[in-house]
């Protein structure tokens, strides 16, 4: 979980802003949830929370359920949102997001 990494109030606000389908924008989300202001170490901790199968990468299926890391009741991303998110983060084109790619993606926000 993100306990001790992000505040509950920031998480609630970030999730509330993207409840509608096709409204998720990763830059806005990372900024609202407070992640883009964090140190590289904290951003790496967040990566390990999202990388549920501990493969060292965030794959498409993990991206689809990205919001559920922040609240179990959150919606899944749509296919279009997932694809946009993946394209934004996957700078080497291998179809998944590594830890350095994730850090770059968060810092762009």
Swiss-Prot record:
Disulfide bonds: none annotated. Ca(2+) 2 binds at residues 90, 92, 94, 96, 101. Belongs to the parvalbumin family. It comes from the Eukaryota. The lineage of its organism: Eukaryota, Metazoa, Chordata, Craniata, Vertebrata. Three parvalbumin isotypes, in nearly equal proportion, are found in toadfish white trunk muscle whereas only one main component (IIIF) is present in the swimbladder muscle of adult specimens. Ca(2+) 1 binds at residues 51, 53, 55, 57, 59, 62. InterPro entries: EF-hand-dom_pair, EF_Hand_1_Ca_BS, EF_hand_dom, Parvalbumin. In muscle, parvalbumin is thought to be involved in relaxation after contraction. It binds two calcium ions. GO terms for molecular function: calcium ion binding. Residues 38-73, 77-109 form the EF-hand domain. PROSITE patterns: EF_HAND_1 (PS00018), EF_HAND_2 (PS50222). This is Parvalbumin beta. Keywords: Acetylation, Calcium, Metal-binding, Muscle protein, Repeat. SUPFAM superfamilies: EF-hand (SSF47473). One of its GO terms (cellular component) is cytoplasm. The keyword Repressor does not apply. The modification N-acetylserine is found at residue 1.
């Amino acid at each position: 979980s993100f306990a001790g990494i992000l505040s509950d109030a920031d998480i609630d606000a970030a999730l509330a802003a993207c409840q509608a389908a096709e409204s998720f924008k990763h830059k806005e989300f990372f900024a609202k949830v407070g992640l883009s202001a964090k140190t590289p170490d904290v951003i790496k901790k967040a990566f390990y929370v999202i990388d549920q199968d501990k493969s060292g990468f965030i794959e498409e299926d993990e991206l689809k359920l990205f919001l559920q890391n922040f609240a179990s009741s959150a919606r899944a991303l749509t296919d279009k949102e997932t694809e946009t998110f993946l394209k934004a983060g996957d700078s080497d084109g291998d179809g998944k997001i590594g830890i350095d790619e994730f850090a770059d993606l968060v810092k762009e926000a």
